[in-house]
Amino acid sequence: MTEQVLPARAIHGVMSVPGDKSTSHRYAMLASIAEGDSQIFNYSTGADCHSTLTCMEALGIRHTAGEQDGQRTLTIHGKGAAGLSAAADTLDAGNSGSTIRMLSGILAAQPFTTGITGDESLVKRPMRRIMTPLAQMNARIEATNGDFPPLTIHGAELRGIDYALPVASAQVKSCVLLAGLYAEGETVVREPVVTRDHTELALRELGADITMEPRVVRLQGGARLEGKTLFVPGDLSSAAFFLVAALITREADLIVTNVGLNPTRTALLDVLRGMGANIKLLHIEQANGELVGNLQIQTSRIRGGTIEGATTPAVIDEIPVLAVLGAVSEEGLVVRNASELRVKETDRIETIAENLRRMHITVNTTPDGLEIPGRQKFRAAQIQSRGDHRIAMAFSVAALAADGACMIEDSDAASVSFPEFYATLRNVAR
């Protein structure tokens, strides 16, 4: 599918974004192995989170969609830690790295063997990073060419480990913790830098014996999780596209409602403010241990900056759209320590650079980042998203500041995380 995006003079209005993808995955998995029903409000409408539900359904977990007080609900009928049953066929995680990596932690402890694979993008993404700690816990996992899906996971009795993550990764941390729920003894995960802690908060909310320290998580095995009512905040990573859209058009006054403001995720706001963005936080509340609030963004003068060190993994998903902002900022943008971008849905360093160049933007790539001079102007172009949802959406935002209409190839990739993206963009762009 190809989407035409026209230039815009302004971004105005009040809008919402889909339920947070990271939180949705975790709630679906944990509710499935909890005792009794969990009612989840605002579960993500994205294809990735649907993949998680499909996998859990294949493992014997029913879910029911509904509505309450005008809000979408999803009820997951949990069966407890021992309630999963062997799938009749290989599980399909679609495009979702979160699904395959985190669910593998649960599957490693089951009394049966499970195959799990994904689409043509996912089968190119490395899995050794989860296989190593799971093997230390006594799991046996076979991978294609030693590192890639499809995976064959032979369930086993697991033992707790003390594991230091070699690279900051919330997915790997979560995989080990989910396995740790079933393990004998204590499981400890140590991080080089703080990563998103949605798994830890959800585990605590559902009754796990978990201790959270700076960069260290301790989990006692054998916990009995209890189903409950859960609210998924709006996805800040999805909001990022509209925050940047407001910053690259001439006039802006935009409010994004009910956005997740978990401190492990708000580095994006710190980066934008550091570049000069005028962002206000409104009506902050707490739901299931997660902070939620409204964001207001208005016309701002954007200076530019550098993303490096511990900040990089904290904004790794937002770098495509931050690169777009960097090109029109006064001083440009430098991104370092972002080699993880090369093993996302595409090699995002190269895909970002390719499409910036298509729009006549000067950019230099490095092994672990990008160097983008500022004060540049976007030219109308045909954008190649390569089927990567964040590339499609980031360059749709760039198109708002172009000198003519842009065509976004494979624009339907946006449905992986934000099915309503283009309709929402049309509603707020003027």
Which sequence ranges carry the predicted segments?
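Structural preference for solvent-exposed beta-strand-turn elements
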Residues: 1-430
